[in-house]
Amino acid sequence: MTVEGIGNLLVLKEGELFVCARRDGDIRACARSGQGLYSSDTRHLSELSLTVGGRSPTPLSMTTQSPYEAVVDLANAGLEGEGGSPIPARALHIRRTFLLGDRLYQRILIRNHSGTRVATEVAIELAADFADMFEVRGACEPVFREPRSALGRIAHGISFGYVGKDEIRRETVVEVTPPGRVVKDSADKARLTWALALEPLQSMEAEFTVEPSLEGSRAPQHSFRGARAIFTSKSKEWLDSCARIDCGSAGLHRVLSRGVSDLRSLMTPSEDGEVIAAGIPWYVASFGRDALLTSLEMLLLTPEPARKTLVHLARMQAGTDDPYRDAEPGKILHELRRGELARSGSIPHAPYYGSVDATPLFLITASAYWHWTADLDTLQQLEPAFDAALQWIDTYGDRDGDGFVEYLSRSSSGLSNHGWKDSQDSIVHVDGSPAEGPIALVEVQGYVYLAKRGMADLYRAFGRSERAALLETEAAKLVEAFNEVFWMPEEDTYALALDGNKNQVRSVSSNPGHCLFSGIVDANRAQSVADRLLETDMFSGWGVRTLSSRSLAYNPMSYHNGSIWPHDNAIIAAGLKRYGLSQEALTVARAVLEAALESPESRLPELFCGFEREEGRTYVPYPVACSPQAWAAAAPFMLLQSLMGISADAPAELLSICAPVLPDHLDHVRLQNVRVGDSRMSLDFQKKDLATSCALVDQTGEIRLSLDE
């Protein structure tokens, strides 16, 4: 992926729209640039640049007010005014306020702080290239389109239009108040200008909106203030529906607050309600694996995203065998795209099913949702989807009948690797050579085990006790075979995978940590697996690396071969706590939470580089990591849930707390509005010396609290 770094961009998202701009508020996209205004995998605005007197203003500050609003303060550069008189630098204060919702709203306020009259021109350059996100990412070569777009004038602005190879007309409609002069530069570029004439301390204000449109559809127009009120109300509704976490650390409180707001911003409209998009800017789309794992991570916060994710993925479940899309009956989607290339069939993503783990994760999430909500009505409606998913695991998943689930890509346009580490070079032998398929990933066997155990409980609730007993028998057989075939005694951990010849892929990786999470690890080996994960070649001080630094394929700057992923570490910490390894879980959680505290935005990115932690230095960012990213934003909530030992059994009206622990810098955590079934609870966790206790503060409903401190 050859794209610009995005760490310093202004990023906003609301609904279907998101914008990535420079910190001065300009959008100046070029090849392989993430900058732009996007909707449905299409860049509807590739340039939005402000000049005053023909020069770009000087940035002063940028503040993100919320995931959908930002304020940029600027000052003019030295200019020549009317009659050639000089306008000194910083004579004009320029404020650009961005608001994103059903369209992009921008308000520009210019105030004259010089002692004399200022007269010059204000201009905004606009362009729309309608690039597909796969072109922007560099995932495919740029598509030649002729004509690229057509520009037209409307009553209060301009519109750009383009008919794609999918025969869909896409438009970008720009409306301006007060009306400016429109200058058409080319087929896909225009300039709006206003004459600026300000006496000392006088101000000028202009507003404009940019609305992406498909086939002429338009959203109702709102004023800037009215739009802000709508989005603020939606944000408050989300916050009120979530559990509240208060703690004694101001830094951690900021991390948690940022996570809650980022997760809300990533909720994206679909036919099934709002579902979680994976991350901005590259993955604002439905990803099965990402949505499911994020839903699991945030069950303590709210179970509602899990319900919507299950309903959405069940509706999109594959019903036919389609090699181009790596689809087979019962399989859960990997990625759903809605841009020109996907709709026209140029790429197989409408949807694409190249994920080996999304299907068992679908079942795991269903079971977890059941335990948190006891919502049998929703789950019974999805029963046919569960049946189909289990059938996929046992037939298409287990390709050769050896009891393990494997993958082998059949699509010439799809992914070569189908686990969460899906980059081309991520599944390698210790000598760095790529493993040949079919590949049986270590963590996927754990997912299948946990899926069958969880579905056995759910099927009993459905009244299908014989099916439940069969699933338990299958899970028990898998545990035995797994621990025999995947174990590497000389490394005291499990192999990354089995290759197509059933040989171990003997690389030491983070993947076995997911096996702790699933419970497939033999109890006598859990400590060994934990110790191996925390050796210096795996644990950097900022978290567990994806691949051992002793591997020939190790690269701390790579995507999957030595980097550190917060969600990966959250799952590992949950697995460690599952086996009673509280101090090891605390070590992992502390590292990741301290990385979050180091972030200037109190936000965990998708991943960061795997370099060793050094005194006085922060982690090294991965330059094109998504930020915000769903499963990274949700990771702190899973970490806290694991450390505090919280598990729910809503069908039994029970919430259990087992051996809670808190990090060194945290002495107190209060949870409020925690939902278990139809009940709500508030809990206090207090640490004194080395012991952490839990007390019930308040509750509604019949839920019982079980304490094992």
Task: State what each model feature region is.
Residues 625-667:
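Catalytic cores of secreted or luminal carbohydrate-active enzymes
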Residues 1-91, 100-103, 115-117, 129-135, ...:
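An extended acidic
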Residues 71-76, 246-286, 311-353, 399-440, ...:
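Extended glycan-interaction surfaces of carbohydrate-active proteins
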Residues 284-416, 442-445, 449, 505, ...:
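Aromatic-rich carbohydrate-recognition surfaces in CAZymes
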Residues 92, 103-105, 112-285, 376-380, ...:
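Acidic/polar, glycine-enriched structural segments that form the non-catalytic walls/loops
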Residues 67-92, 174, 659-685:
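Edge strands and adjacent loops of beta-rich recognition modules
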Residues 113, 119, 197-199, 205, ...:
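Beta-rich accessory regions
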Residues 220-234, 251-258, 302-316, 375-394, ...:
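Extended, well-ordered alpha-helical scaffold segments
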